[in-house]
Design a protein with these regions (language model features):
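Short, exposed "boundary/linker" segments that immediately precede the start
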Residues: 1-3
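Double-stranded RNA-binding/processing signature
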Residues: 8-220
């Protein structure tokens, strides 16, 4: 992938991949100047590449399990996680309001931008280059991504198997209504095991459950 910082010199498609609708609206840009159409295209490329990868690499899994595994990889939180090595949030063109309320770290914006990048690569370099990007930055560490996606369910099954009680406790809520930050703790038999943060209680619980699973895995 070309460095997103170079997008200024790479023409319209490479500007659009990083342009959020809030920026386009604020700057009164022409119609379809944001990255939403590229996101649509990138989503389709991501689906076929991820499907082919899982079909080839997991020959023993039935259709239902493959579908669930694919969902764990292409879901919003996981795609946002995949943007970290690219530092994609740094290069996004956001409206001032979106920028000031944490838009560069918002999972929905990051995951949409990643799909837009895939769409831009497809248009510029064809399917082979887009596939290479997906395999390099997304279709890696599958087991860990599935663990992240299913963290609450997997943790629930683990704790039940140990005949212990699992609960979640909201320990902090901060920020304005449009940009809330929640901190949630995982309690096992009343003892705090891990914490997680997120812009919703559900996201914070998922992160806390994931951290708890990593702790249990390291103890094994």
């Amino acid at each position: 992938i070309r460095d997103p910082e170079m997008s200024r010199g790479l023409g319209d498609v490479y500007k659009r991949q990083l342009t959020h609708s809030s920026y386009a609206n604020e700057k009164h840009m022409k119609k379809h100047s944001d990255n939403e159409r590229l996101e649509f295209l990138g989503d389709a490329v991501l689906e076929i590449v991820s499907s082919e990868f899982l079909f080839i690499n997991y020959p023993q899994k039935p259709e239902g399990e493959l579908t669930k595994l694919r969902a764990s990889i292409v879901c919003e939180p996981t795609l946002a996680l995949c943007t970290k090595p690219l530092d994609l949030g740094k290069y996004l063109r956001l409206g001032r309001g979106e920028d000031h309320t944490g838009g560069r770290k918002r999972k929905s914006i990051l995951s949409d931008a990643l799909e837009a990048v895939i769409g831009a690569i497809y248009l510029d370099g064809g399917f082979t280059n887009a596939k290479e990007f997906v395999l390099r930055f997304i279709m890696t560490d599958i087991e860990n991504k599935q663990l992240f996606y299913d963290s609450k369910t997997i943790l629930q099954e683990l704790i039940q198997g140990r005949h212990e009680q699992l609960s979640y406790e909201l320990i902090d809520e901060s920020g304005p209504d449009h940009d809330k930050q929640f901190t949630v703790a995982v309690l096992v038999d009343g003892e705090r095991v891990s914490e997680g943060e997120g812009h919703t209680k559900k996201a914070a619980e998922q992160q806390a459950a994931y951290q708890a699973l990593l702790l249990y895995r390291n103890r094994e």
